[in-house]
Amino acid sequence: SYLATFTLGATAAIAMAGAAMAQEVTNRVAADTDWAVFEVESPKECWAVTAPKETVNTRDGRVVSVRRGDILLFVTWRPEKSIAGEISFTGGYPFAEGSTVTMDISGTTFELFTEGEYAWPATPTEDQKIISAIKRGANAVLTARSSRGTQTKDTFSLLGATAMIEDAEQRCGS
């Protein structure tokens, strides 16, 4: 089921985020403007990834300073699991139980479902719609709520996204 794939994807995405940050020198295979591509061989996985250009955290309508882990937006290919172009987002904190993340790309909105510190679209079809919007858009704004009630708004540049998504797909597409 797609939800089971999400759960497996969550574990892999967490591992990838760590790998992306900790082993950038050895795993990064391409970069363009605000996006990069990482590749690992066993099992073969490729992902295009970007970090936000701006983050705003609010509680009760006031801007607050909070500690967050890595904040990343991914597009991932895992050929051995038949995953192609899976969108995922980590906000660097546990999301509020049962909450969703709103992704706004140049006025087109999408809903991502949360589990732990990660969020994904509901279906592979939705992944593809988001990828199309990313390729046409200038930025993506992701709004979410933490388990502590903090509202977060992360703005990601989409400059370089098309080239890096296509690069990752070429490396790992089936």
What positions do the PLM features span?
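Sec/Tat signal peptide C-region and signal peptidase I cleavage site
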Residues: 16-22
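A generic "folded-domain core" signal
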Residues: 22-174
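Bacterial N-terminal signal peptides that target proteins for export
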Residues: 1-10
